[in-house]
Structure formats: C-alpha cells, structure tokens
Amino acid sequence: MQHESPIKRRPSTRIYVGDVPIGDGAPIAVQSMTNTRTTDVAATVAQIKSLEKVGADIVRVSVPTMEAAEAFKLIKQQVSVPLVADIHFDYRIALKVAEYGVDCLRINPGNIGNEARIRSVVDCARDKGIPIRIGVNGGSLEKDLQLKYGEPTPEALVESAMRHVDILDRLNFDQFKVSVKASDVFLAVDSYRLLAKKIDQPLHLGITEAGGARAGSVKSAVGLGMLLAEGIGDTLRISLAADPVEEIKVGFDILKSLRIRSRGINFIACPSCSRQEFDVIGTVNALEQRLEDVLTPMDVSIIGCVVNGPGEAEVSHLGLAGSNKKSAFYEDGVRQKERFDNDDLVAQLEAKIRAKAARLDEKNRIDIKHVEQD
C-alpha cells in the first residue's frame, strides 16, 4: 500500500507554466503534444480536451506559421489547461502567440536564429511573464556543433543548451526550463546527467521520437526511469507515434511505478497460468477501462490463485485471491468474510473499488483540513 519513494529529487529553481508549478520539489508535470493541424481549431481543441480529461498538466501545440498563430488565439480561448507554443525557425511567431496568452514558449536553439532574435523573444516573455523552454534535440543541432562533434553526443547537446542558457543569463532572464532530447536512450540519459551538473533550472525530460505505442513506451520507461530514479527531471513528455492520450497514461504509469507521483489505481495483476480460477486478463482489462475516471491513488491486487494472491492482497488497499468458484476478498490487508463469485467479478470489484476510493478521498480531505488548522 502506497510506499513512499526513496528517490531524492535534484534541487532546482521554480517556474510556473500557467498555474502549474515546475521544479523546486513540485509534482513532476506530465504533458503531451497535439498532432492535429493547428489551423483546424475544432479538432485541436477536441484533442486538448481529451488530453485534459486523462490528466494532462500541460499541452504543447505546434505553431509553424502566422496562420497557425491566429488559430492558436482561438484555441487558447476554448481550453483551460496551460498551453506551450512550439516555435521553430521564425521568432516572430513567438512574439505573436505571446500576445494571445500563451503559457510557455518552446524555442529550438538549432533553428531559432541569432542572439538578436532570442533577445526579442526574451524581452517579450519578460514583459508578459511567460517562461521559456530551451528545447535541444539531437536531430536538429546547430551546424557548427554537427561539424565539431561529427554526430550528436551528450557534449554536443549540452553545449547547444548552455549557449542559450548563457544568453538568457546575460539577459537576466531566469524563468526557463531546459531539455536535451534524443531518440537514443543512452544519448538522452547521458545528456541530461551532464546538463544536471551544470545548471539548477528545471529539466523537461523526454526520449524524442521514441517510436510506436509499445516500443516507444518501453524505450521511454527505460530512459526516463533511469533519470527519474536518480532524482533528475521536473516535467516530462512521452513521445509516441500514437494517440497523444496514450502519452499521458504512460507518463503517469512511469511516475506511479517509481512512487514519485501516484494518480489513479495501481493494479497488481498476475500474468495468469493454468492455476487461475478466473479470467485474470479479462478482469483486469475491464476494470482498467471502467475505472479510468478514478484518480485516487490506491493499490488493487488481482491474482488468479492462492499461490501469491493472499500475500499481494495483504499489502494492497484491496485484493482478490482466486479460489475455486468463489474468490477471497481483502481490504487493507485483512481477509473479508464475503467471497466473490468468479463468474461475476468485474461489477462486484468495480463497486468495491469506487467505494474504497471515496473513503480514501474523504480521509485525505479530513487529514488536509487538520494540517491546515494546525
């Protein structure tokens, strides 16, 4: 049941993207990016709202043209989640979306232009209280760094980042975060490790262009898991060639696995074998779909037999241990008198889980109230 994470977070400064705190011990923010055409306002708004529904803290939107900037204005008016404008090549687009209430500007050092252009963006951001993300990517390094290093290396990515960190420092602008993304896990991990030793600004994590839903999730979990376990990272995005909603789900699953940020149900379920007394896979899949709206952090174990079932149930908020015809049910580690019919588990478990979530929410509300009074 909800053990505390042993991970000690890297100290960092604090910025805000809209009303979302980033860095300095704030919860690690999970974000995604729209893949609609930004000029299709209705489709983009719909996708942003679907991301917000599954818990996205921040959403990034590509703004490649002035026409897209005008569409961004309309999009911003229709959503409540903080929006980051993704800017490449034309710094003037950053100035335009700043007028329309953007919550953060992402600029790419590899293509945004010279220091004078960066100064224009920084001056505008300062005037309007907008933070910036320096977003370095292994696939779009500056040409001189490509020539110097021959290929993307941790040193090349970090040198690119530090050039722009130094510019922002000279301009006395400290409201920024940094990312050094690469599609190779070790390149990304080593780049972030090196950067973390050089600056104390918040770091945005990601394995860029990670791949499809399955392979990309695994690659991201490995790479980001390594960094997060070392305390590195203040916000993250899982980059998948898939529905952006999956990026949010995977991001929270990674944080949940490391006990860094728990949101929703942590299902402990066996892969099933011939000893299973009920359909474990079907039961878990059905419960995951039915209970996506439950945000209460809790552990629920669904084990198909008595080999590991009781042991897992004893350390879960709720647990089911498969047995012949009727399965044993546990709450807070204690076996209950009632047993569940193996042919009708999903509805019974859903009701129990929702009731438990409500009780935990009420307990948490009371605990918070007592802390505030003290």
Swiss-Prot record:
<comment type="similarity">
    <text>Belongs to the IspG family.</text>
</comment>
<dbReference type="InterPro" id="IPR011005">
    <property type="entry name" value="Dihydropteroate_synth-like_sf"/>
</dbReference>
<dbReference type="InterPro" id="IPR045854">
    <property type="entry name" value="NO2/SO3_Rdtase_4Fe4S_sf"/>
</dbReference>
<dbReference type="InterPro" id="IPR016425">
    <property type="entry name" value="IspG_bac"/>
</dbReference>
<protein>
    <recommendedName>
        <fullName>4-hydroxy-3-methylbut-2-en-1-yl diphosphate synthase (flavodoxin)</fullName>
        <ecNumber>1.17.7.3</ecNumber>
    </recommendedName>
</protein>
<keyword id="KW-0479">Metal-binding</keyword>
<keyword id="KW-0414">Isoprene biosynthesis</keyword>
<keyword id="KW-0408">Iron</keyword>
<keyword id="KW-0004">4Fe-4S</keyword>
<keyword id="KW-0411">Iron-sulfur</keyword>
<feature type="binding site">
    <location>
        <position position="270"/>
    </location>
    <ligand>
        <name>[4Fe-4S] cluster</name>
    </ligand>
</feature>
<feature type="binding site">
    <location>
        <position position="305"/>
    </location>
    <ligand>
        <name>[4Fe-4S] cluster</name>
    </ligand>
</feature>
<dbReference type="Pfam" id="PF04551">
    <property type="entry name" value="GcpE"/>
</dbReference>
<dbReference type="GO" id="GO:0005506">
    <property type="term" value="F:iron ion binding"/>
</dbReference>
<comment type="function">
    <text>Converts 2C-methyl-D-erythritol 2,4-cyclodiphosphate (ME-2,4cPP) into 1-hydroxy-2-methyl-2-(E)-butenyl 4-diphosphate.</text>
</comment>
<feature type="binding site">
    <location>
        <position position="273"/>
    </location>
    <ligand>
        <name>[4Fe-4S] cluster</name>
    </ligand>
</feature>
<feature type="binding site">
    <location>
        <position position="312"/>
    </location>
    <ligand>
        <name>[4Fe-4S] cluster</name>
    </ligand>
</feature>
<comment type="pathway">
    <text>Isoprenoid biosynthesis; isopentenyl diphosphate biosynthesis via DXP pathway; isopentenyl diphosphate from 1-deoxy-D-xylulose 5-phosphate: step 5/6.</text>
</comment>
<dbReference type="GO" id="GO:0019288">
    <property type="term" value="P:isopentenyl diphosphate biosynthetic process, methylerythritol 4-phosphate pathway"/>
</dbReference>
<dbReference type="GO" id="GO:0141197">
    <property type="term" value="F:4-hydroxy-3-methylbut-2-enyl-diphosphate synthase activity (flavodoxin)"/>
</dbReference>
<dbReference type="InterPro" id="IPR004588">
    <property type="entry name" value="IspG_bac-typ"/>
</dbReference>
<dbReference type="GO" id="GO:0016114">
    <property type="term" value="P:terpenoid biosynthetic process"/>
</dbReference>
<keyword id="KW-0560">Oxidoreductase</keyword>
<dbReference type="GO" id="GO:0051539">
    <property type="term" value="F:4 iron, 4 sulfur cluster binding"/>
</dbReference>
<dbReference type="GO" id="GO:0046429">
    <property type="term" value="F:4-hydroxy-3-methylbut-2-en-1-yl diphosphate synthase activity (ferredoxin)"/>
</dbReference>
